[in-house]
Regions:
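Extended catalytic cores of very large enzyme megasubunits
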Residues: 1-330
């Protein structure tokens, strides 16, 4: 084997053991390549067991042979999460997703996607955010406790519960409407504990911090208004997702990947990463931001204003589109 090939082999194997090989508790070691391939292919057999036939088994066995010999490469997400972990959360198969901040479930759905390890592209364009229900002040003496389940659904639902306590309608957890919510994190495994797939638990601190910051964000918006009911602004929705993303250590492997799309006349979003944002709003470092520009509807002055921000701060990016309802992934 040449020195060049030795280097490639070392790089390949180090990446495999760093990000894809599972810890084998029974044998007190990491999986070999062939064991990982076997885990992935057995997952496919389990998923489609009701549709198996001798012909299909023959094809799967041939694919497995090519996979094991590295003549072909399957989905890396299947290699990373393959087995019951992926069968229980099939969104783990996807690298990236995209959606709109136009409904109450958007927030917990985005958190769920991030916890599955998928990147999230999301639009906080004004015509999307306008579809969200208003938020209102909560009753001081009305208190409910939410015990956060030790699961990615539980983590995601905790943000749904928090927002449900503020939304005036269409809450995903209506029983918490108007309540002061106390979060109980006692069910969450401590930092470093092993979780499914041989990964390590991040502990509750990141989640606790994110929920606190999201609550402070909403309370600040309510205090700024003399009205009992107010609308969330695009910058609020953006920061809410950024706080969630800051709490995610997906699968014990990587942080979140996000891209935020916003309206061209949204000055707050245009300036989201200006000045001392990295000190005052470090959570915004979890996203790339892009202004949505509909073709043939952009003036020279609007373009100059956007380019000034890009020149001074490196962001936002810009996306020319035929339709403002098109969305993009990170």
């Amino acid at each position: 084997m040449t020195q060049e090939n030795i280097g490639k082999k070392m790089l390949s194997e180090s990446k495999f053991f760093m990000g894809y090989s599972r810890w084998d508790e029974d044998n007190n070691r990491y999986e070999t390549w062939n064991e990982s391939v076997n885990r992935v292919m057995n997952m496919h057999r389990k998923k489609y067991k009701d549709k198996m036939s001798p012909e299909l088994e023959e094809l799967i066995s041939f694919a497995e042979k090519m996979y094991a010999e590295k003549q072909s490469l399957g989905a890396q997400r299947a290699l990373q999460f393959g087995g019951d972990q992926l069968l229980n959360h099939e969104m783990r198969t996807y690298n990236c997703t995209s959606t709109y901040a136009d409904r109450p479930r958007f927030f917990q759905e985005s958190m769920y996607m991030l916890l599955c390890g998928a990147g999230v592209g999301f639009s906080v364009q004004k015509h999307h955010v306008a579809k969200l229900p208003k938020i209102h002040k909560r009753y001081e003496k009305k208190v409910k406790v939410f015990t956060v389940p030790d699961s990615i659904e539980g983590w995601a639902d905790s943000f749904g519960v928090l927002l449900s306590s503020y939304f005036v309608e269409d809450a995903t957890f209506p029983e918490y409407r108007g309540c002061q919510v106390h979060f109980d994190f006692s069910k969450i495994r401590p930092k470093g504990a092993l979780i499914s797939g041989g990964f390590k638990a991040p502990g509750p601190d990141g989640l606790r911090s994110a929920l606190t910051k999201c609550e402070e964000l909403i309370e600040k918006r309510l205090k700024e208004s003399e009205q009992n009911e107010v609308n969330l602004r695009p910058i609020d929705c953006y920061d809410f997702v950024m706080f969630m993303a800051d709490a995610v250590l997906s699968g014990g492997v990587r942080r979140s990947a996000t891209i935020c799309m916003f309206s061209k006349d949204d000055d707050e979003m245009l300036k989201a990463k200006t000045g001392n944002w990295f000190i005052d709003n470090p959570q915004r470092g979890r996203s790339n931001n892009s202004v949505m520009l509909q073709r043939d509807e952009l003036t020279r002055e609007e373009w100059k204003n956007i380019m000034k921000s890009v020149k001074d701060f490196g962001e936002p990016g810009f996306i020319f589109t035929d339709n403002l309802d098109f969305a993009f992934n990170p």
